[in-house]
Amino acid sequence: MVGLTGDDSAAVELVPSLMAFRAEPGLPDIQVRVEWTDELTPASGLQLFDSGALWRLYECEAGFQFDFRAPVFGDEPYKRLLVNRDFSRATLQMSAEVSGAFPYAAPLDYPVDELLIMHRLTQEKAIELHGCGIVRADGTGNLFVGHSGAGKSTTTRLWMEREDVEILSDDRIIVRRDEGCQDDRAQKQVPPLRFANGRNDKVFMRNDKPSTRNYNASIRNDKSNMRMYGTPWHGEAAYGSPGSARLGSIFVLEHGAGNVLTRLSASQAVAELFARSFVPFHRHEYVESALEFLQELVSAVPCYRYAFEPDGGAVERVLELCD
């Protein structure tokens, strides 16, 4: 859970894509305090990373400093995130000048929200993957991962045309160990993130809501203790749900002929998933944590390379495997 606090309603304003993830107040995993400042002084710490576009990362006394820039706001940072080393407490400083001239610059707009969660996941047994999560009517959860252009949005549309499915996201999925894997679906699952509001206004974002699909059917793979969660960060098909589902199978998408499925070895699966993950590469311990979790993931969930054609036969081939 991410708790967002501030002295007025503007401090906890959510962009539309986050509204479905709003939650009631509770004990946050990440507490963020929003402040407005007249001046964001130049960064003085060691630069750790430069995204080449929207943000730069520095070391600071508290832990880490993220400076965010955008051409429309000029050359200087328009917001700054100061966060401790375990990503549990942060201060988000907003330029009062920019906020006054551009009121649509909300505190948790992209990429602040995703960077917070991506880094927090390094402290837990969890990872964000570049993929689409599809939940069938019987509760079966399948994850289709792929680089940009590999066919995630196409896969989403093919499944929606074929049967009644729930799309958790068509571009970003979080996977974590299901701490309540033997419990009934109605049991509260441990979420990877949530965001909350009030005053000292708070806004939470959450995605711990189980899918509305039939849970009992989704536990046919008794070995799987992994769960996938929707996120607000969608692709061209624009699907982002706060739902979650037990993860049954993972498919690494690539364009091909004949809709060919090939079971991957554990080492192959780890390499393929790591190449399609969102991991902070600026610290070796974050990379090591991600690799350790991926090893656990592929030992629990079968992974396949899927060379597919963009037609209904691609769905039928997966159904043959899963049914």
What are these regions (language model features)?
Residues 155:
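Hydrophobic positions on the alpha1 helix immediately C-terminal to the Walker A/P-loop
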Residues 177-227:
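Intrinsic disorder/low-complexity segments
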Residues 150-152:
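Conserved glycine(s) of the Walker
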Residues 1-148, 158-166, 173-177, 225-323:
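A noncatalytic interaction/capping subdomain that flanks phosphate/NTP-handling catalytic cores
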